[in-house]
Amino acid sequence: MSWLEKIFNTSNIVSSRKASIPEGVWTKCTSCEQVLYSAELERNLEVCPKCDHHMRMKARKRLETFLDAEGRVEIGAELEPKDVLKFKDSKRYKDRISAAQKSSDETDALVVMKGTLLELPVVACAFEFSFMGGSMGSVVGARFVKAVDAAIENNCPLVCFSASGGARMQEALMSLMQMAKTSAALARLSRKGLPFFSVLTDPTMGGVSASLAMLGDINIGEPKALIGFAGRRVIEQTVREDLPEGFQRSEFLLEHGAIDMIVDRREMRQRIGGLMAKMTNQESPLVVPVDGSH
């Protein structure tokens, strides 16, 4: 073997390992496409620090960051979905439920908790969009009614964060009945004089937007949230007209009086806490006075 062959002999070369980066360390913003450090994004409540784009947030994480840390109690966790109709499309509904539970780490698309917000008692619930598109089935309806019952029992406000594609197709008429069921429950809450704060996040569509999501005493949108009943293309085909740009975004809805305000997720605790204190005539040392100009 010549001296040159000895130098380039592969057995003498020690390969340097590529530094392995664990999965999930970095995230790309879906709006500005900046690469973000996941831990920083989580600290910022899933709001892009570069462009303020509000990304979708897990229901449980949303409630844990919204409510005070002490005294949170989950409600309705014992209720689980059942395939009463033995429904099957391209896949059995039973299999869809199992897959959704595994991927989302939730048993259904609504998580309910009671606790306090800035030391004021409250019941809060949030839709889990990763569970079958946050669709509303029998369990979602039943858990929402339990949330209303808990608010009445504790004489406190109810807050709901909606993120849903609408009624759950696989439960047919039973899912449509949840629109009436949740609306009737909110009527009971209203008769008791207890406020309901509805926070519409991206996306809030279909049967959820046509029922509980739009029945708030105060309807709050997150910035640039998609809110509506049917999709843009379906509406354009029906009315045979071109629709204005962004007509289903929260900014357009605020401009036309369909919602009451738009609140940045990072300010949600203070804004809702301040409104709760005013509407229930309570005081909390943690509430910053709400500016009436907004």
Curated annotation (Swiss-Prot):
GO terms for biological process: fatty acid biosynthetic process; malonyl-CoA biosynthetic process. Its cofactor is Zn(2+). GO terms for cellular component: acetate CoA-transferase complex. The keyword Transferase applies. It catalyses: N(6)-carboxybiotinyl-L-lysyl-[protein] + acetyl-CoA = N(6)-biotinyl-L-lysyl-[protein] + malonyl-CoA. HAMAP family: AcetylCoA_CT_beta. Belongs to the AccD/PCCB family. This is Acetyl-coenzyme A carboxylase carboxyl transferase subunit beta. The gene is accD.
